[in-house]
Swiss-Prot record:
Main location as per UniProt: membrane
Binding site for substrate: K71, N116, R117, M118, G119, F120, N178, N183, N252, T253
Co-factor binding comment: Binds 1 FMN per subunit.
Tree of life domain: Bacteria
Catalytic activity: (S)-dihydroorotate + a quinone = orotate + a quinol
Organism of this sequence: Deinococcus geothermalis (strain DSM 11300 / CIP 105573 / AG-3a)
Cofactor(s) the protein requires to work: FMN
Protein name, per record: Dihydroorotate dehydrogenase (quinone)
Keywords assigned by UniProt, alphabetized: Cell membrane, Flavoprotein, FMN, Membrane, Oxidoreductase, Pyrimidine biosynthesis
GO cellular component, one term: plasma membrane
Pathway: Pyrimidine metabolism; UMP biosynthesis via de novo pathway; orotate from (S)-dihydroorotate (quinone route): step 1/1
Localization (cell): Cell membrane
Positions of the catalytic residues: S181
Binding residue positions for FMN: A67, G68, L69, D70, K71, T91, N145, N178, K223, G251, G273, G302, Y323, T324
Amino acid sequence: MYRRLLRPALFRLDPEDAHHLTLRALGLASAVPAWPSLVRRLTAPTDLRLTQTLWGRTFSSPLGLAAGLDKNGEAVPAFGALGFGFVEVGTVTPRAQPGNARPRLFRLPSDEALINRMGFNNAGAEALQGQLAAHFARPVPVWVNIGKNKVTPNEEAVQDYREAVRVLQAVADAFVVNVSSPNTPGLRALQAAGDLAALVRAVLDEVEAGRVRTLSRPPVLVKLAPDLHPADFEASVGAVLEAGADGLIIGNTTLRREGLTHPRRGETGGLSGRPLTARSTELVRAAYRLTRGRMPIVGVGGIFTAEDAYAKIRAGARLVEVYTALIYEGPGLPARLNRDLARLLARDGVRHLTEAVGVDL
């Protein structure tokens, strides 16, 4: 139904207008008390082979919603009802900012991809805190992706990340330190090993300082870009590990454009979707080797099928996330991926998802 009816209608709209319309509808659905729980009864993953516990939290599925789709936490209950094992909101900055000028989001249907140059448009940490506090009954863990404001120089970036943690710690089940978006000038420079280690330590210190006040100690993950030179990637992974972070997300959008066919392939911004499938899996495998399996890895990039997700798990990911595929495949995608992933495990005689992690090294 989505591919035949809804997607053609949405794809006639400007991509960002379609995004806002969809979020508004899901936000309204989230406000209906019985709707999310009713839908989740139909879509929630039930195969125990997919369930795992990480950082003291239970994930009913390894499949999560990646950051960027629900920046301000407007539709968390609705996304949780679709069959995701967790939902990542943001990127959020301490202070609200409008992001880059429109148009800033582009579909590339022939490549099953998106290009965005959004620029961390969001309502700010205080607004997100209010939204998440209102969703007191959460069907799944909610992660918060944090970044620095555009006007904040890199030398002061640490304070922005710390401020975001202070405001949001009580409502975050995990923090994701975003230093890899290509759409905020200078942000990716924070991936340099020395700067990254200092930033991660500062965020961990802030989380520890807020532990008594919030009665929570959310894990801290770091999201890296897929465009790093191999030596820089190795140094950044080492810095994250040495600083004591709790996990890695591999990776963000790419500036590469190899193999694209759509006329809008030259738009400035980060590319996501099908063109990243192989590259992101390769980087998950590299990160798993570098960490020797000591740090949970979340694989992101080009996941459209259960086979795509399974490949990342076998490369070393404990969890995976989707975004672009949801735009192309629709709201039935999470439940379908969960069912198909369980079938793949059964086909291979895998008793539990964790047995498949890293087997393809």
